[in-house]
C-alpha cells in the first residue's frame, strides 16, 4: 500500500514525534527545576530542542505538501477533521479553568471572607489594559479574516499586509499582558483568585504566543509563494486557531476581568 499511488495520508517514518516528546519532558522537568532550585539549564535545553523539532517537523510537512504533492484533497479533509478535533480538545481544556473559577466565585467559602474577590485582593480595572487587550485581539480577528479573503481572491500583497498586521497585534497583546502581570497587585500564590487568574490568562497568553508563531511561519511561507486560493490548509488552520484564541479571550474578559472584579 505504501509503495503505490493513492490519495490517502501515509506518512513517512519520522523522528520528530519522539524528539518532540523528549523536549516536552525536558521543558516540564526544567520548569520544576526552575521553580524549586532556580536553575534554568534544563528548561533552556528543553526549549532549544523543542524549537529545533518544530522547525524540522514543519520543514518536512512543507516539503511533503507543497513540493511533493502528498496533501491530496482526501488528505486535506483528514487534516481539517484533525484540526477541528484539536480545537474541541482545547475548548475542553479551558472549560476546566472556567469551571474552577466559577466554582470558587459563585459560592465563596468562609476562608475567602464569604465574598468575591476574596478579602484583601484588589482586582485589575477591566476598563484599562484588559479592555485595550480585548480591542487588540478583536482587531487581529478582523485582519486575519481580511488576509483569508485576500488569499481566496488571489491578492497576495493584501494578504501579506493583513497577515503582518495580525502578527504585530499578537505581539502587542503579549507585551501588554506581560506588563499587566508585572504590575498586578496580587500573585499566583494569593489564594484561589490568584491561581485561577494567572493559570487561565497565562495559558491563554501561551496560546497567543503559539498562534503568533504559527502565523509567522505562514507569513514566511507566503513570501515564498507556498499558498494558493485552492491549496492553503496551513494558513487556514492558523486562522481557525487564532479565532479560537479570540473567542477564549472574550470569555476570559467577561468572566474574570469584568464580572469577577
Curated annotation (Swiss-Prot):
GO terms for biological process: mitochondrial electron transport, cytochrome c to oxygen; respiratory chain complex IV assembly. Its main location: mitochondrion. It is found in: Mitochondrion inner membrane. It is a multi-pass membrane protein. The chain crosses the membrane at residues 16-34, 41-66, 73-105, 129-152, 156-183, 191-223, 233-256. Keywords: Membrane, Mitochondrion, Mitochondrion inner membrane, Translocase, Transmembrane, Transmembrane helix. It catalyses: 4 Fe(II)-[cytochrome c] + O2 + 8 H(+)(in) = 4 Fe(III)-[cytochrome c] + 2 H2O + 4 H(+)(out). Residues 1-15, 67-72, 153-155, 224-232 are mitochondrial matrix. Pfam families: COX3 (PF00510). It is an enzyme of class 7 (translocase). Its EC number is 7.1.1.9. GO terms for cellular component: mitochondrial inner membrane; respiratory chain complex IV. Gene3D superfamilies: 1.10.287.70, Cytochrome c oxidase, subunit III, four-helix bundle (1.20.120.80). It comes from the Eukaryota. Residues 35-40, 106-128, 184-190, 257-261 are mitochondrial intermembrane. GO terms for molecular function: cytochrome-c oxidase activity. Component of the cytochrome c oxidase (complex IV, CIV), a multisubunit enzyme composed of 14 subunits. The complex is composed of a catalytic core of 3 subunits MT-CO1, MT-CO2 and MT-CO3, encoded in the mitochondrial DNA, and 11 supernumerary subunits COX4I, COX5A, COX5B, COX6A, COX6B, COX6C, COX7A, COX7B, COX7C, COX8 and NDUFA4, which are encoded in the nuclear genome. Component of the cytochrome c oxidase, the last enzyme in the mitochondrial electron transport chain which drives oxidative phosphorylation. The respiratory chain contains 3 multisubunit complexes succinate dehydrogenase (complex II, CII), ubiquinol-cytochrome c oxidoreductase (cytochrome b-c1 complex, complex III, CIII) and cytochrome c oxidase (complex IV, CIV), that cooperate to transfer electrons derived from NADH and succinate to molecular oxygen, creating an electrochemical gradient over the inner membrane that drives transmembrane transport and the ATP synthase. Belongs to the cytochrome c oxidase subunit 3 family. This is Cytochrome c oxidase subunit 3. It comes from Litocranius walleri.
